Amino acid sequence: MGKSQQRKGAAGERELAAILGQYGYSIDRGGSYSMGEVPDLTGLPGIHIEVKRVEKLNVMEAMEQSIRDSQRMQDGIPALFHRRNRKPWLVTMRLEDWVTLYKAIQGETKAGQSRDNTLSIHSQNYLK
């Protein structure tokens, strides 16, 4: 990866961290120079954040990287956050992971736990 690509990736990580910070999440950068030793961003427990800030993205390759890294790091559901110039941020997930999150949100009880224990998240912490 060239230095300009690394700079753009680091800028994308900082940009996304700032946006998530505006939603109230305390996000830390792992550093784009870590070469996969730590996640790109941390601060959403249960979600492995992979950030791509490129004009041409091979979504399947990037998602496979996110899946591999999330399995290796055991830090949560793989989610690919990506955007192109002058375009909004998008999030790509496997359907099964999206359904898991959706079931947890829909099945949440007053105690804050999902009825089917699919994933113990609190929707107010993840979705605003």
Language-model-derived ranges and their functions:
Residues 1-128:
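Catalytic phosphate/metal-binding cores of nucleic-acid and nucleotide-processing enzymes, i.e., regions
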